[in-house]
């Protein structure tokens, strides 16, 4: 009868104790690239994705965002006299987004590549 009164507890798994603290904290990293030159932008995107895949990271992208087209229309004549002739200028801003899942130290190594002139890089790090 004494054996029936003993409460049964399942054995603890020793492999799980302290497992979370020994692993590096994983972050979601979003790298946003923007440029007026598509050629330079695609080169930097390719270098970033290649570097991330070499380190066997989880990569999503590059995602092509809509191109922003900025228009400016001005008169050619500085004095306002004469025929109304107009100049039309436009600037196209191309944007790419790359998402990674890794630790912050690894991202520093990946983003240390040479960035082409005219390419703006924005890195956003958030917890997963």
UniProtKB/Swiss-Prot annotation:
One Pfam family per UniProt: Ribosomal_S10
Gene Ontology cellular-component annotations: cytosolic small ribosomal subunit
Keywords: Ribonucleoprotein, Ribosomal protein
SMART domains in alphabetical order: Ribosomal_S10
GO molecular function, one term: structural constituent of ribosome
GO process annotations (BP): translation
Family indicated by similarity: Belongs to the universal ribosomal protein uS10 family.
HAMAP family hit by this protein: Ribosomal_uS10
Protein name: Small ribosomal subunit protein uS10
């Amino acid at each position: 009868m004494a054996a029936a009164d003993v409460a049964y507890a399942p054995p603890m798994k020793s492999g799980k104790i302290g497992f979370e603290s020994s692993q590096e904290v994983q972050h979601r990293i979003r790298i946003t690239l923007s440029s007026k030159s598509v050629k330079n932008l695609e080169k930097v995107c390719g270098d970033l994705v290649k570097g991330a895949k070499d380190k066997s990271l989880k990569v999503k992208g590059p995602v092509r965002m809509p191109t922003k087209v900025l228009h400016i229309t001005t008169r050619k004549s500085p004095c306002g006299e004469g025929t109304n002739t107009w100049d039309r200028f436009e600037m196209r801003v191309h944007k790419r987004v790359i998402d990674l899942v890794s630790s912050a130290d690894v991202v520093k190594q990946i983003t240390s590549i040479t960035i082409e002139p005219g390419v703006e890089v924005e890195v956003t790090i958030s917890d997963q």
